[in-house]
Regions:
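A short, N-terminal "cap"/entry segment at the start of jelly-roll beta-barrel domains
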Residues: 1-15, 119-127
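Short acidic-glycine-tyrosine-enriched beta hairpin
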Residues: 53-72
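Histidine-centered metal-chelating micro-motifs
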Residues: 27-30, 48, 67-68, 72-77
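His/acidic/aromatic-lined binding-pocket segments of jelly-roll/cupin-type domains
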Residues: 20-21, 31-32, 37-42, 60, ...
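Conserved short histidine dyad/triad with adjacent acidic residue
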Residues: 2-6, 17-34
Length: 127
């Protein structure tokens, strides 16, 4: 049995949360926004980070060691543009990844496949 006194004395993160997106070539996340900032940092591969500036879509390409921060309320997405699977680290403000707000074009495309957005911003099958 594990000794509880040997457990690390680290608390939960406060003020931010992070995770990793491991994606095959051509895959990533569609346009969405959070009620927090979001920072992207590739661990490997080459990534397209794209966002909406009004009606115009803008894009930057990142590789390992690069970083970009996207402000609150800006639609953003990412895609692995490498020729092999790659990993992207993301950090968001707040203690969780925050509710996702999908771009209307993403919701329209999802509905055509039988999906709908639930109260948490998740795309779910319509029953």
């Amino acid at each position: 049995e594990a000794d509880p006194d040997l457990a690390p004395k680290l608390g939960n993160a406060h003020g931010f949360a992070h995770g990793f997106a491991k994606c095959d070539p051509g895959c990533g996340a569609a346009l969405h926004w959070h009620e927090t900032e979001e920072v992207f940092m590739p661990l490997d591969g080459k990534w397209s980070i794209y966002w909406r500036d009004g009606e115009e879509e803008r894009e930057v390409f990142l590789e390992a060691g690069d970083t970009v921060s996207v402000p609150i309320g800006i639609y953003r997405g990412f895609k692995n543009v490498s020729d092999k699977p790659a990993t992207l680290q993301f950090i968001v403000g707040g203690p969780d990844t925050g509710k996702v707000h999908w771009h209307p074009s993403v919701i329209d495309a999802a509905r055509k496949t039988g999906l709908e957005v639930d109260d948490n911003g998740l795309l779910v099958e319509i029953e």
